[in-house]
Amino acid sequence: MTLQEMKKKVLGLIEELNPLSEYLTDDPDIQAKINEVTNQIMFELVRFKKMPKYVEIHVNEGDILEFADIEKECGYEIYQIDIICGVRYVPKASGTVLKFMETGTAEISCFVYPERITEKTKDKAYEFELSQDVLEVMPYGIAGDLLKSDVSTEYGAVYSNRYQEMLSRLDHRYQMPTMYIDGGVDV
């Protein structure tokens, strides 16, 4: 889904959509806030249903890697490391720094934030990297936040409540845990 499609969904929900307007709405407050509100909801959702990434980095014994080094390799802002295989390491600084105890290839699975939306972001070009179920929840969170300061109506609370309800039903897993055992002992 593109940013433009998301904006159309949100603005349609809150009855502020004007498809003839360059900004899809005539409301200047919504025009000014929609990108930042979209970021806030997107980042909230991605901490609930994490965005996994995988990267391989060649390391030498004694090398120290920080989040920034891993971010350069994978091209995303990391907020949590999941699993590291392939080489022995010792986590430092609450796991944000890794000291490698041997030479080899570090196979790093981590969780990242999506690309941030700015005023320069092209609505038609920006593609959300979130799962389909998250994209179905997201418009309600955006709508609720856009309307929460509008005290003349209850729309903000209606959309916020719907968002919380949908969020509580969202499954944070991408797959069910599985185990494969190879080999074994003949008795």
PLM regions: where:
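Glycine-enriched, solvent-exposed interface loops adjoining structured elements
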Residues: 1-187
